[in-house]
Amino acid sequence: MKRTFQPSLLKRHRTHGFRARIATKSGRQVLARRRAKKRSRLTISNR
């Protein structure tokens, strides 16, 4: 059986990136939660 994690930056950014978060209501809620916690990195795309 192959391993499930096959890294790809493009897929990673498209799924978890900033623009992906902004695009949906729930994604914006994620960003709001992370801003409230004062996270230094809101999403994986702006490391």
From Swiss-Prot:
It comes from the Bacteria. One of its GO terms (molecular function) is structural constituent of ribosome. Keywords: Ribonucleoprotein, Ribosomal protein. Residues 24-47 are annotated as: Disordered. It comes from Baumannia cicadellinicola subsp. Homalodisca coagulata. Belongs to the bacterial ribosomal protein bL34 family. GO terms for biological process: translation. This is Large ribosomal subunit protein bL34. One of its GO terms (cellular component) is ribosome. Residues 31-41 have a biased composition (Basic residues).
